Amino acid sequence: MSTGENIKRIRNIRGMTQKELGIAIGIGEESASPRMAQYETGNRTPRESMLNKMAAVLEVDPRNISIPTGYREEDMIYRLLAL
């Protein structure tokens, strides 16, 4: 999975909308949902500082967002929790 797919997966596990996550990391209310959609689809790449904010809000290690899935034991845990 890509960084964007990881953001979406973890956001969904946490039960947050794109807008809620965007606002929580400091994006303006009107821009929050479109910007998060850009990150999740890979049309825009979040800076490291933005990834760190997302990780803090989503309560995960930043590496869980930026490292491709399939390489971490945590991935299996998240997949199991999502069932």
Residue ranges of predicted features:
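Residue-level signal for the short linker/turn that defines the boundary of a DNA-recognition helix
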Residues: S2-E5, G15-M16, S31, P46-S49
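Short basic helix-loop element that most often maps to the first helix and adjoining turn
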Residues: E5-G26, R79-L80
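DNA major-groove recognition helix of helix-turn-helix
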Residues: I25, E40, M50, L58, ...
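Recognition helix of helix-turn-helix/homeodomain-like DNA-binding domains
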Residues: G26-T45, I67
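DNA major-groove recognition helix of helix-turn-helix/homeodomain DNA-binding modules
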Residues: N43, R47-N64
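Short, charged recognition helix plus adjacent turn
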Residues: S66-L83
